[in-house]
Amino acid sequence: MATVTPNFNWPVPTSTDLVKDGATAIEALGDSIDASLVDLKGGTTGQVLSKTTNADMDFTWVTSDDANAIQNTIVDAKGDLIAATAADTPARLAVGTNGQVLTADSTAATGLAWATASSGSTNVAGKNGVLNSQFNVWQRGTSGSASGTSAGTGYNADRWWNYYAGTMTVSRQATGDTTNLPFIQYCARIQRNSGQTSATSIYHGQDFETLNSIAYAGKTVAFSFYARKGANFSGASSALALSVQSGTGTDQHVLSGFTGSTNPISTSATLTTTWQRFTYTGTIPTDSTQLAVYFTYDGVGTAGANDYFEVTGVQLEIAGSASAYSPNTSTYQAELAACLRYYDKRGGQTGTGTILNNALSNSAGTNAAFNFPVNMRVAPTSVEYASLRLSDTSSGFTVSSVTLTNCTPTTANVNVATTGMTAFRSCYLDSSATGNYIAFSAEL
């Protein structure tokens, strides 16, 4: 008895069929195969089979539409893309250059275009570890002698210390250059005063406290800055030495010596009278807990009127190469707050200005408390003052001394001494002359 094939149900004889029945079954099989393959018959040269319906073996011969297919020749190089200039109109978009990104562009023929990837804002807060790196903050005054000859002395621009055995002046100057500088308004001028003959090294630098240094341990860093020289700069071969120094101690001053000192970057820059940017890289040791950056040169002969160098846009970042300059913070207010952590000055007004109200007098002066707007690095270690007086309801009394008593990083208690006051009167601290101030230091 005939059976059928599993896929097309074609009848086939079985092993039990009689000979005559087998022949009949074979004939039926042939007819079934012929009927199933009828759609494969015919066609002309170049035609291809196309499904007519979803039914099995239901085909139709059709002419190939190669002309409307996307041809291989439309692309010419690795990375080419196929786009369109209109409906049903494919077109080639040539590969871009390394680093470019594909963007929508309605002005382009294909509506697409290659463009340089945005690097984002160049002003990235926190990237640069150097505080007051464009020399905007000068609480101590924008010009002054800086003959500090020991650690912790000779500060002028906030956070920047100076050292020279002779007499030098550090001052804020307008850069006056928007061609070679990225619109930085100010720089520091470090000047060997005219007539000086001391050949000792002149230093200008900044120490990082340990809290801000540890993040650099084991990292590759890029150190960059802008600098130029004065017409009488006496450094040999117009060279300005520079260093990024690391240590393993805690909150030390580099002039006193870092414990475990190393110099991941130590080289020199050749200055001209035009602003240039200098960039250097190095690797901070993995056990580093403190950092400093500084510039130095040895004066030669007798200093002329313009024996100085100027520097600005100083940047230390964790990077394999220097990026565009960015200050530590994004606003002057934030940069000032960062500097107040180390030095807090009150007063400095022209004429009479009140510094502190609501004190209570005794016959020898008063005890006064100052609250800091920003927590200092540590409790202040020194107090500075000038042209102060204590005034009560009837008189003013010149201040003879100000001493720290009980201090914390948030508050300074001071004893303000004078003579001749009447006890238990309300009094206030103000000026006896132009330039009155009181300042608290927690510098390294």
Residue ranges of predicted features:
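Extracellular repetitive beta-rich solenoid segments
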Residues: A2-P6, V12-N128, T153-Y155, T302-A303
